[in-house]
Amino acid sequence: MAEHYEHPYPSSELESQYPFVHYEHERFTEEEMRNRAHDFYEQMERRRSVRMFSSDPVPKSLIETAVKTASTAPSGAHKQPWTFVATQNPEIKHAIRVAAEKEEEINYLENRMNKEWQEALAPLGTDHHKEFLEIAPWIVVLFEQRYETNVDESTSKNYYVKESCGIAAGFFIAALHHMGLATLTHTPTPMNFLNEILDRPKNERPFVLFPVGYPLKGVKVPDLKRKDLDEVLFSC
């Protein structure tokens, strides 16, 4: 199909009202694209969730770069409805662990989790013990901003908040793995205690918690198999 657009973007009217710039894009040969795609896939295919971390320190600059990468994610109306809170403070990490384990004890030991959920988790061997929340050098919590608060205390709506935060979380995980760090998507249920411990405003809600660090030497992970391509991709 010829590259003819009846409705060019941006329109001259739109461009007269809002700033636009030329998109800087480098086009590779098909061979280069295949090589880049294969290398990236091979790297990401080795990514695993880790539950045992080394306590070796991780520079703050690496966490900052991962968050900057996450913040390049697309979001509804470009509202970027997320806040990342990172801490390496031992007292704060201890408080998070205590609160998380309290909720998880109810989930695992008092059957707040239904039987089907527990059976699904069985191959992972998870339980209410969350030592990694103190041992990992960093805890990073991604909060979703349900709405924005303005200087005059008025509020503005955010759009596709969960979808936007989910994409940002994926970028964050990929950035960590790319630089040689490990993480885990941890969602103790409920997570409201994180607002209090991390002193977050009421318009923010915990979305996911990431312990971040180097994997413990010799750590084992479940021998899981990912779905084949023909199970996740259908071409029309």
Kindly label every feature range from the protein language model:
Residues 104-113, 199-222:
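A glycine-rich helix N-cap at a beta->alpha junction
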Residues 78-81, 134-136, 205:
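Short, basic and Ser/Thr-rich N-terminal targeting/leader segments
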Residues 71-78:
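Glycine-rich phosphate/pyrophosphate-binding beta-alpha loops
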Residues 47, 66-70, 146-197:
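Small-aliphatic-rich amphipathic alpha-helix that forms the alpha element of a beta-alpha
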Residues 69-71, 123-128, 194-196, 219:
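Glycine-rich, charged/polar anion/phosphate-binding loops
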Residues 2-32, 123, 127, 208-236:
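C-terminal helix-cap and adjacent tail motif
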Residues 1-65, 88, 98, 106, ...:
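N-terminal accessory segments that position/regulate proteins before the catalytic core
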Residues 2, 86-165:
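Glycine/small-residue-rich phosphate/adenosyl-binding loop
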